[in-house]
């Protein structure tokens, strides 16, 4: 009986882990961020700051398969946990 119970627990844990979907912050608004579930294959969240002028930055957040490449005057942070790109 104990073996059956242990087997069911292990199977449940494995099945739950296979269905995991990463959630990243998507909205560009600092004050009212929204989130999105990342599609299959996109296992990273990113946040990109782009320098526009002194004290002025544009930023973008979302899901990515790989960390986006920084362009001129960009700062990019990538991470792999839920809503880590706040």
Swiss-Prot record:
Record bears the keyword Protein transport: no
Note: Negative results: does not show interaction with adrenergic receptors (ADRA1A, ADRA1B, ADRA1D, ADRA2A, ADRA2B, ADRA2C, ADRB1, ADRB2), dopaminergic receptors (DRD1, DRD2, DRD3, DRD4, DRD5), histaminic receptors (HRH1, HRH3, HRH4) and serotoninergic receptors (HTR1A, HTR2A, HTR2B, HTR2C, HTR5A, HTR6, HTR7). Does not show interaction with muscarinic receptors (CHRM2, CHRM3, CHRM4, CHRM5).
Reported effect, residue 59 to I: Decrease in affinity to CHRM1 and change from irreversible to reversible binding
Domain notes: The finger loop 2 blocks access to the orthosteric site of the muscarinic acetylcholine M1 receptor. Comparison of MT7 alone and MT7 in complex with CHRM1 shows that finger loops 1 and 3 undergo large structural rearrangements upon binding to CHRM1, facilitating extensive interactions with the receptor, while finger loop 2 is mostly unchanged.
Region (Finger loop 3): 66-78
Protein name: Muscarinic toxin 7
Organism: Dendroaspis angusticeps
Residues covered by region (Finger loop 2): 44-63
């Amino acid at each position: 009986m104990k073996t059956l119970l242990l087997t069911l627990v292990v199977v449940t844990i494995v099945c739950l882990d296979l269905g995991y979907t990463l959630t990243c912050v998507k909205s560009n608004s600092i004050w009212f961020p929204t989130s999105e579930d990342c599609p299959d294959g996109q296992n990273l969240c990113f946040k990109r700051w782009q320098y526009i002028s002194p004290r002025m930055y544009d930023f973008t957040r979302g899901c990515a398969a790989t960390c986006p490449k920084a362009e001129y005057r960009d700062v990019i942070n990538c991470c792999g946990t839920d809503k880590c790109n706040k």
